[in-house]
């Protein structure tokens, strides 16, 4: 099962359109956030646990209909939705096998009251994101953490060694993998990357491979795409 959370002022249908995650051999859930937002952001109307309860309710309903593998439930999301994916991975690690935030907004509330239980994590972010800066900043009068800060926290939580391996995956992006972790931790740094789901139809940069973020997220989750005939 993959939960895919849309960005602020977006909706589930748009997330489905640009992510193409339903090409995966998995049950993909595209929820709609109340007022087009998700918990953890200062503008969300669901702060206080409402969206986490919503996710749990969806899972309960799914298990009554489908033979859900409870050890293979994952979450990803874009921007505010990426921050929410990080939040539920932080606070509900026993439910999720892994998370993959993309261009995520890591407001301070995202990492409040984190469990000490490790969770597999892949972060994807563009270095020139003008909306949610790679180096952190302030939006809606609220501070959000930088990508390096978030990865440092995740490395401690997953008990990773300081050593990492970095290699180029294409002309626009590098991948960094931490060593010795209890559960995997990886980061894809998109050079000159904008605020987008990298490789989506609306990402017009020629140096970013088509469906790059989707392919990397599914690879990290260990999920293959449905074969095309």
Name every feature range the model reports, one short phrase each.
Residues 71-119, 130:
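Primarily recognizes the serine-hydrolase "nucleophile elbow" in alpha/beta-hydrolase
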Residues 129-132, 195-196:
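Acidic catalytic loop of the alpha/beta-hydrolase fold
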Residues 32-36, 105, 193:
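Short beta-to-alpha linker loops that shape the active-site pocket of alpha/beta-hydrolase fold enzymes
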Residues 124, 145, 157-229:
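C-terminal catalytic histidine-bearing segment of alpha/beta-hydrolase fold enzymes
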Residues 13-20, 105-113, 170-176:
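Alpha-helical scaffolding within the catalytic cores
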Residues 20-24, 67-68, 91-94, 113-117, ...:
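Extracellular/periplasmic catalytic domains that process cell-envelope and extracellular macromolecules
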Residues 1-74, 78, 83-87, 91, ...:
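Serine-hydrolase catalytic machinery in alpha/beta-hydrolase-like enzymes
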Residues 123-125, 129:
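Short beta-strand/loop motif that positions the catalytic acidic residue
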């Amino acid at each position: 099962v993959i939960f895919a959370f849309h960005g602020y002022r977006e909706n589930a249908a748009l997330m489905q359109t640009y992510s193409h995650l339903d090409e995966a051999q998995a049950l993909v859930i595209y929820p709609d956030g109340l007022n087009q937002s998700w918990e953890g952001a200062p503008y969300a109307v669901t702060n206080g646990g409402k969206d986490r309860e919503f996710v749990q309710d969806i899972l309960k309903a799914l298990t009554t209909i489908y033979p859900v593998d409870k050890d293979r439930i994952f979450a990803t999301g874009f921007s505010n939705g990426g921050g929410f994916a990080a939040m539920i991975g932080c606070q509900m690690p026993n439910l999720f096998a892994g998370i993959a935030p993309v261009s995520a907004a890591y407001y301070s509330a995202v990492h409040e009251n984190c469990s000490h239980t490790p969770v597999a994590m892949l972060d994807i972010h563009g270095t020139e994101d003008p909306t949610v800066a790679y180096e952190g900043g302030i939006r809606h009068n609220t501070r959000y953490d930088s990508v390096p800060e978030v990865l440092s926290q995740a490395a401690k939580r997953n008990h990773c060694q300081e050593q990492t391996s970095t290699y180029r995956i294409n002309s626009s992006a590098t991948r960094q993998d931490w060593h010795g972790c209890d559960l995997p931790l990886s980061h894809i740094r998109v050079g000159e990357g904008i605020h987008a789901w990298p490789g989506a139809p609306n990402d017009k940069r020629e140096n970013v491979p088509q469906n790059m973020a989707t392919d990397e997220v599914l690879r990290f989750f260990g999920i293959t795409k449905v074969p095309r005939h």
